[in-house]
């Protein structure tokens, strides 16, 4: 089995589904006359890296030299996301494409989530030869690759990325999504959560 270097000494590349987590904070003081829902007066907006971006900033917080790669739209949300990622010390190596950046918007009041709205599509159509070659070039610069899959299409051709890592002898860690773990064949380590593991083993 491939030895995984200590993260404290390794350059780690996170490839996966990058998204923006947006929080609207405010006070819910009354019920709307239009429908039985609270009216929230928004007082603060908080933008954070989500998905693979969250994984990358958590690694950077542990002192790991981290690069983030994936796909985003060529839009204002991508600009905000890049700023939030780089502020945490993560190198931004994310490709823009014609899709819209994924945004997950949560409306919060008194530390309670009232609703979540997802603005997203699939990036599958944009995982082309240029993105795969770009990813292979990044793989050559790093000691460990972490694939962060949220089933949004960025890792639609995950087998190609795993093969590229194996050819270079680079360890591949996978944070999987769904029950088809066969697509991650060749990875050094797969780290499902309990529900994902139970779905696979029955």
Identify the meaning behind each predicted range:
Residues 33-40:
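Peri-catalytic substrate-binding/gating loops that frame the active-site cleft of hydrolases
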